[in-house]
UniProtKB/Swiss-Prot annotation:
Residues 54-424 are periplasmic. It is found in: Cell inner membrane. One of its GO terms (molecular function) is ATP binding. This is Tyrosine-protein kinase etk. Pfam families: AAA_31, GNVR, WZC_N, Wzz. One of its GO terms (cellular component) is plasma membrane. Keywords: ATP-binding, Cell inner membrane, Cell membrane, Kinase, Membrane, Nucleotide-binding, Phosphoprotein, Transferase, Transmembrane, Transmembrane helix, Tyrosine-protein kinase. It comes from Escherichia coli O157:H7. Residues 1-32, 446-726 are cytoplasmic. The chain crosses the membrane at residues 33-53, 425-445. The keyword Transmembrane applies.
Length: 726
C-alpha cells in the first residue's frame, strides 16, 4: 500500500520538478553534441584572436586654459565670476575638417598602400610565423578615377628595384626612383623593402573619405568635468603611424589656437588705431574751449565742492568709456545673452545712474561754475581716454608679437605597447559561453518541440494499455545505419536484400528479450478471443510494425508452435527481403485468384515459421483485402496454425488495417519511440474501434534509454519490465 503525504503541495510542483529533471536529462543525453559545439565555438574564438590584426591605441593630453582675453578685456575680470574653460567647442574643433584636413595633407593620408595577403587568414598567419611585412615608400602618387569609380592598382615587386604596376586597363613596368606615368596614373616609388613577388594594393581616396576614416578612429574626451584637460585617442594597426597622426592633430590644433589669438589682437589693434586720432582731436577741442571760456571769464576757478564733483564725474566717464571699448570687443565674441555681455551691460547701467545723480548736483551750482565744470570734465575725460588708448595700443602690440594662445600640449602622443584589440582571453571566454549557450539552447528547444511518445505513461494517460516496451537494438542499428543513410526512398530501401534478422542472428539482444515478454502477455490476452489470429499495425510509417511482427513470429516459433506470417501490406511490404524468400507468388496473387494457397505459402527455415509475402503490388490493395478469399484464408490459417500474425499497413495512412482487423481475434498497434505522438496513437485506436476491430493495446517500439526519460518518468527496462518510482 502506498502512503501519500497530505502536506505535499499540489501536483504542479512535482510536475515542475519532473520537467526540470527531464531537461537536465536532455542535456546529459546530448552531452557529446554540447561539448562538440562548445569546443567548436571556442576554437573559432581562439583562431579569431590569433589571426585577427592587433589594434593599438595612442593618446595625448591637451590643456585648454581659461581665455585671458586681450588688453581691451583685461579689466573685465573684476565684474564677472571666474568661469571654467568651455571644452565642448574645443572638442568639436579638434574633430573638425579644418584640423584633420591639415593632418591628412601633412602625412599624405589620402594615399593607401596595403600589402596583399591570402584572404581572411593570410595577414594573421604571416604575423604568427613572424614574417616581416614589406615596406613601400611613395614620394608621389596620383590615381584618377575610372568611369566614376576609384581605381585600385596592384604593384608586384621585382628584382633589383624593378616592379610591375597593373591596373584594370594596363600593365607597365617601373623602377625605384623613376617617375612612372600611364593613362593618367603618376607614381614615384622612393624605396621598396620587400621580397620579390610581394604584392601591394595602391589606391587614392578623396580628402573627405580620408577625413571620415580618420574621424572613425579618433576620439576626444574631457578627462574630468570642467577640468579643461582633453584626452585625444586614436586606434589603428600601425603604432608608429597613429602616433604621428595624433601628434600632427595636436600641433595643428595648437597652431590654429595661436593664430586665432593673434587675429583677435590684430583686430583690436586696428580698432584702437582708428580711434586714437578721433579721441586726440576731441581732446584738443575740449582744451581749447576751456581756455577760451576762462579767458572770457577772467580765469574762473572751481571751488572745493565743484572739484570733488568733477573728479567723480570724470571717474564715471572714464569707466563708461572703458566699457564702450570693452563692448566693441565683446560684441565680436559673444551674444548679448552671454553672462560676460550681461555683466558689462549691468555695469554700464549702474554707472549711468551714478552719472545722472552727479549731474543733478552740478545743476544746483551757479551757471558759471556749471560751465567750467562741464568744460573741465570734457578735458579730463578726453585726456584719460586718450592715455588709456595709448597704453592699450602698446599692450596689444606686445601681445600680438608674443601670442601663445590658451592651449598647450601636456603629454605628446604615445602608443600603448599592448594592443587593445582583440582581447584574447575575453574572446575565448565569450566563444565558450556562446557555444555553450547555442548548443544548450538547441537541445532544449528540440526537447520542447519534440512531441513523440517517450514513455508508456504518456499512452496510459490516454487510456491506452501498453503491452510491451521494446528497446532499440544497438546491434541491428549498427548494421543498418549505412542502408538508412542511402539517398533512396523508403520503398527502395525496403527492396534491399540481406537485411539482418535479429531474432535469429542475435537472439540474446535486449529487443528480442522484450518480444519474448510480449509473447507471454499475448498468451493471456488471446485466451478468450474467437480465433488465434493476431493483427499488428502501426500508427504511421516507420513505426517498426514489421520488425515487431516478424520477431514475434520467430520467438513464438521457437517455442514449438506452428506460426504463419502474412504480409498484408500490399503497398510497401518488404518481408520477402527480410526473410530472403521469393515474392513472385504472394498474397496479392492469391486474393486475385491467380494462385492457390499451396503456391503462396513458403517456409522460412531460418525463423522456423511459414510466410505469405505480399506478392506483386496490385492497383487496388484495399479491394483485394475486402474479398471473401481473404476471409477464407484467415479461417483456413486459424485451423491449421497455432498462431497467425498479419502485418498490415499503418492505420493513419490507409484503411487496410480496419478491413483486415474485422476478421482477426486480437490486434495490437505499434508506436515508435519519439516518432509517434500520443494523439496519433489515440486516433488510430479510435478508428480501429469504430471499424469494429478488437484492439487490445499498443507496443512502444524502439525505446532509447535516455537520462531525460528516466528522470522524467522514472522507468527502466530489461526486456519488458518497467517500474514506477514512488
Amino acid at each position: 500500500m502506498t502512503t501519500k503525504n497530505m502536506n505535499t503541495p499540489p501536483g504542479s510542483t512535482q510536475e515542475n520538478e519532473i520537467d526540470l529533471l527531464r531537461l537536465v536529462g536532455e542535456l546529459w543525453d546530448h552531452r557529446k553534441f554540447i561539448i562538440s559545439v562548445t569546443a567548436l565555438f571556442t576554437l573559432i574564438a581562439v583562431a579569431y584572436s590569433l589571426l585577427s590584426t592587433p589594434i593599438y591605441q595612442a593618446d595625448t593630453l591637451v590643456q585648454v586654459e581659461q581665455k585671458q582675453g586681450n588688453a581691451i578685456l583685461s579689466g573685465l575680470s573684476d565684474m564677472i565670476p571666474n568661469s571654467s574653460p568651455e571644452s565642448a567647442p574645443e572638442i568639436q574643433l579638434l574633430q573638425s575638417r579644418m584640423i584633420l584636413g591639415k593632418t591628412i595633407a601633412e602625412l599624405n593620408l589620402r594615399d593607401m598602400v596595403e600589402q596583399k595577403y591570402f584572404p581572411i587568414v593570410g595577414r594573421g598567419w604571416a604575423r604568427l610565423t613572424k614574417e616581416k611585412p614589406g615596406e613601400l615608400a611613395i614620394s608621389w602618387m596620383h590615381i584618377p578615377q575610372l568611369n566614376g569609380q576609384d581605381q585600385q592598382l596592384t604593384l608586384t615587386v621585382g628584382e633589383n628595384g624593378h616592379y610591375t604596376l597593373e591596373g584594370e586597363e594596363f600593365t607597365v613596368n617601373g623602377m625605384v626612383g623613376q617617375r612612372l606615368e600611364k593613362d593618367g596614373v603618376a607614381l614615384t616609388i622612393a624605396d621598396i623593402k620587400a621580397k620579390p613577388g610581394t604584392q601591394f594594393v595602391l589606391s587614392q581616396r578623396t580628402e573627405l573619405e580620408a577625413i571620415n576614416a580618420l574621424q572613425e578612429t579618433f576620439t576626444v574626451s574631457e578627462r574630468s568635468k570642467e577640468s579643461g584637460m582633453l584626452e585625444l585617442t586614436m586606434t589603428g594597426d600601425d603604432p608608429q603611424l597613429i602616433t604621428r597622426i595624433l601628434n600632427s592633430i595636436a600641433n595643428n590644433y595648437l597652431q590654429q589656437n595661436i593664430a586665432r589669438q593673434a587675429a583677435q589682437d590684430s583686430q583690436s589693434l586696428e580698432f584702437l588705431q582708428r580711434q586714437l586720432p578721433e579721441v586726440r582731436s576731441e581732446l584738443d577741442q575740449a582744451e581749447e574751449k576751456l581756455n577760451v571760456y576762462r579767458q572770457q571769464r577772467d580765469s574762473v576757478d572751481l571751488n572745493l565742492e565743484a572739484k570733488a564733483v568733477l573728479e567723480q564725474i570724470v571717474n564715471v566717464d572714464n569707466q563708461l568709456n572703458e566699457l564702450t571699448f570693452r563692448e566693441a570687443e565683446i560684441s565680436q565674441l559673444y551674444k548679448k545673452d552671454h553672462p560676460t555681455y550681461r555683466a558689462l551691460l549691468e555695469k554700464r547701467q549702474t554707472l549711468e545712474q551714478e552719472r545722472k545723480r552727479l549731474n543733478k548736483r552740478v545743476s544746483a551750482m551757479p551757471s558759471t561754475q556749471q560751465e567750467v565744470l562741464r568744460l573741465s570734465r570734457d578735458v579730463e575725460a578726453g585726456r584719460a581716454v586718450y592715455l588709456q588708448l595709448l597704453n592699450r595700443q602698446q599692450e596689444l602690440s606686445i601681445s600680438k608679437s608674443s601670442a601663445i594662445g590658451n592651449v598647450r600640449i601636456i603629454d605628446p602622443a604615445v602608443t600603448q605597447p599592448q594592443p587593445v584589440k582583440p582581447k584574447k582571453a575575453l574572446n575565448v571566454v565569450l566563444g565558450f559561453i556562446l557555444g555553450l549557450f547555442i548548443s544548450v539552447g538547441a537541445v532544449l528547444a528540440r526537447a520542447m518541440l519534440r512531441r513523440g511518445v517517450e514513455a508508456p505513461e504518456q499512452l496510459e494517460e490516454h487510456g491506452i494499455s501498453v503491452y510491451a516496451t521494446i528497446p532499440m537494438s544497438e546491434w541491428l542499428d549498427k548494421r543498418t545505419r549505412l542502408r538508412k543513410k542511402n539517398l533512396f526512398s523508403n520503398q527502395q530501401r525496403h527492396r534491399t536484400k540481406n537485411i539482418p534478422f535479429l531474432a535469429v542472428d542475435n537472439p540474446a539482444d535486449s529487443a528480442v528479450e522484450a518480444v519474448r515478454a510480449l509473447r507471454t502477455s499475448l498468451h493471456f490476452a488471446m485466451m478468450e478471443t474467437e480465433n488465434n489470429i493476431l493483427m499488428i499495425t502501426g500508427a504511421t510509417p516507420d513505426s517498426g510494425k514489421t520488425f515487431v511482427s516478424s520477431t514475434l513470429a520467430a520467438v513464438i516459433a521457437q517455442s514449438d508452435q506452428k506460426v504463419l506470417f502474412i504480409d498484408a501490406d500490399l503497398r510497401r511490404g518488404y518481408s520477402h527481403n527480410l526473410f530472403t524468400v521469393s515474392n513472385e507468388h504472394g498474397l496479392s496473387e492469391y486474393l486475385a485468384g491467380k494462385d492457390e494457397l499451396n503456391k503462396v505459402i513458403q517456409h522460412f527455415g531460418k525463423g522456423g515459421f511459414d510466410v505469405i509475402t505480399r506478392g506483386q503490388v496490385p492497383p487496388n490493395p484495399s479491394e483485394l483485402l475486402m474479398r471473401d478469399r481473404m476471409r477464407q484464408l484467415l479461417e483456413w490459417a486459424n485451423d491449421h496454425y497455432d498462431l497467425v500474425i498479419v502485418d498490415t499497413p499503418p492505420m493513419l495512412a490507409v484503411s487496410d488495417a480496419a478491413v483486415v482487423g474485422r476478421s482477426v481475434g486480437t490486434s495490437l498497434l505499434v508506436a515508435r519511440f519519439g516518432l509517434n505522438t500520443a494523439k496519433e496513437v489515440s486516433l488510430s485506436m479510435q478508428r480501429l474501434e469504430q471499424a469494429g476491430v478488437n484492439i487490445k493495446g499498443a507496443i512502444l517500439n524502439g525505446v532509447i534509454k535516455r537520462a531525460s526519460t528516466a528522470y522524467s518518468y522514472g522507468y527502466n527496462y530489461y526486456g519488458y519490465s518497467y517500474s514506477e518510482k514512488e
